Amino acid sequence: MRTDYCGAINTRHLGRTITLCGWVHRRRDHGGVIFIDLRDREGIVQIVCDPDNVAAFPIAEKIRNEFVLEITGLVRHRPEGTVNRGIPSGEIEVLVSTIEILNPSLTPPFQMDDDNLSEAIRLEYRYLDLRRPAMQHNIRLRHKVTMATRVFLDQHGFIDVETPMLTKSTPEGARDYLVPSRVNVGCFFALPQSPQLFKQLLMVSGFDRYYQITRCFRDEDLRADRQPEFTQIDIETSFLQENDIMDLMEDMIRRLFADVINVSLPDPFPRISYADAMFRYGSDKPDLRVPLELTELTDLMQDVPFQVFRDAAQKPGGRVAALRVPGGGELSRKEIDEYTRFVGIYGAKGLAYIKINDLTKGMEGLQSPILKFLPEPVVQSMLERTQAQNGDLVFFGADKVKTVNDALGALRVKIGHERGLATNLWQPLWVVDFPMFEWDEEEKRWQALHHPFTAPSQGHEDFLATDPGKALSRAYDMVLNGMEIGGGSIRIHRQDVQSKVFQALNIADDEAKLKFGFLLDALQYGAPPHGGIAFGLDRIVAMMTGTDSIRDVIAFPKTQRAQCLLTQAPSTVEEKQLRELHIRLRKTDITTD
């Protein structure tokens, strides 16, 4: 039907007769001449319909926004003074010879160039929202990322293997989406949270370099960077150490950013231990664009009169830390109160501070409600450690280690960006040497920090039985600008070690056999050393496009309530369908919004 795309027309087409198909972006009537901005996936071109064209002009008069048209016409220069440098086709226009309305359109609920739409209306009319140039750009960029990924992995000997979507329910940290089996009454499949176990089994099978760009499903509370179904670049390889895998994956991410958005990432990525990241940044996903670090003060506050600091310093598992804000002395009381409320979200009970007005005046040059509770030598040591300067402000956190890290870590990022301290550079890094386990206070048992198939660090295997809290893992996370974009590890390839990890997690042998017997059996048949990583495709594309929500880079996403406003899913089903699945709903379980 068409010879060219609208957005691809330029001065090279001058004098040619072409046929275009697309949607009416805008129609204008100027002095009897009708101008149409015709849009397709490549962009917009200006169409001109002259009243002398007695066949086409009456049709053009009927045209409205979002009508679908087929137009044939002559490419010519735009008149002097009407060139539009804002679009690639801005130097030319197409003079209509014939025009056909392929399909009219109802009046759309919004304009395609409206940037202030509510997300609800966008998701309800997603098929229209996807016509908008910004969304077209996002989805096409996503395609470029997946294509570049496939090319890189193919060049490095990886093969694409599909793994099952209907699988067994196994605990991986979030709720499973369950699918009832009609044939096997009372039994359920689970949609995969990841292909973790299957890709390990592929390593046992001898497919030593596997990848898959696959859908994963997690029934969890949603945020801007989470969806109930999401896409993962899943990778596994045999006979490589963690440094080999990290080097290879660095190369892949560098290639993606260079090829897709023309960004050169550093080579190599810096590497930092989990303990160092928490100590310096209060987060295992540090945003290195922010040049602020936490300063340790626990040892200084052991005997100070200020009880809040003293108690946190003396109690096991407590921490006192400081965050210096360059130029923060200009912060108003109102702004400090807002930051105090902010850290309260993370469990902090308050936010002490000291303003540095004039260091030459000693204690007299400082301003703070807590100064009277702190001996001068302690204050001077604090100022030296934080390297505070005149005009700075120092915030303090004093509580359990987790609370201090969470609160000051989040405050560090917030202040860094709000006060213009962050750079505009891309700052990737690897975080390594994660703990194997974290203690669950509610359940009073250890939980796997990553997943229970992560191998312990060399020399840490004995801790699995004696002191799980000391065991480090061979896990590694790739972090970019404060966001985890990929996480992986060397896996356990010996059955005896896997059994020890299950025991440390308080998973009894019979339960382990029931849930993971197939894996334990496979590990006894010559399983090779192996490891891998998974990248969040949605998150990577969102960062490349500069959007805050992965919903802007997914064609048909769900809301934060895991609903599709377009199709009204999830929905009720017919009683007959439930009977076939041997399911009966109790009325007390049925809720309506």
UniProtKB/Swiss-Prot annotation:
Q: Which reaction does it catalyse?
A: tRNA(Asx) + L-aspartate + ATP = L-aspartyl-tRNA(Asx) + AMP + diphosphate
Known PROSITE patterns for this protein?
A: AA_TRNA_LIGASE_II (PS50862)
**Where do the segments described as Aspartate lie?**
196-199
The Gene Ontology terms for molecular function here are: aspartate-tRNA ligase activity; aspartate-tRNA(Asn) ligase activity; ATP binding; nucleic acid binding
Q: Which GO terms describe its biological process?
A: aspartyl-tRNA aminoacylation
Q: Where in the cell is it found?
A: Cytoplasm
Name recorded for this polypeptide: Aspartate--tRNA(Asp/Asn) ligase
Q: What is the lineage of its organism?
A: Bacteria, Pseudomonadati, Pseudomonadota, Betaproteobacteria, Nitrosomonadales
